[in-house]
């Protein structure tokens, strides 16, 4: 699973998702991509589930790029613990995905396979997405 090797700080603020993505809105590597419509927090597990679904559909052909990286530590308190007594310990990593951000890109497979792979990947993600082509 994706996680940063080093961190400057152990815990992060909850934060908010930015209004619209400023960078990473155009296809850079592949011919087909998965673009977010909503802004939401995507966890490392969800990214990995999407990657597995897409590569399984592509039958290990072509190439898949993941354009997002989970770098925000999300903390959580244990179940049935009273309020207060500090912030919980870091539980998992997530990335804040803004609307318009390209999340996955595919190259080197037929169009119908690429579209199916991106559909399967989008089903694993908590954001609404749309599939974009290079020349659209």
From Swiss-Prot:
SUPFAM superfamilies reported for this sequence: Ribosomal protein L16p/L10e (SSF54686)
Entry-linked InterPro entries: Ribosomal_uL16, Ribosomal_uL16_bact-type, Ribosomal_uL16_CS, Ribosomal_uL16_dom, Ribosomal_uL16_sf
GO MF term list: rRNA binding; structural constituent of ribosome; tRNA binding
Any GO BP: translation
One Pfam family from the record: Ribosomal_L16
A GO CC term attached to the entry: cytosolic large ribosomal subunit
Keywords tagged on the record: Ribonucleoprotein, Ribosomal protein, RNA-binding, rRNA-binding, tRNA-binding
Protein's job: Binds 23S rRNA and is also seen to make contacts with the A and possibly P site tRNAs.
Record family assignment: Belongs to the universal ribosomal protein uL16 family.
Subunit note: Part of the 50S ribosomal subunit.
NCBIfam families in alphabetical order: rplP_bact
Protein's name in the database: Large ribosomal subunit protein uL16
Originating species: Rickettsia akari (strain Hartford)
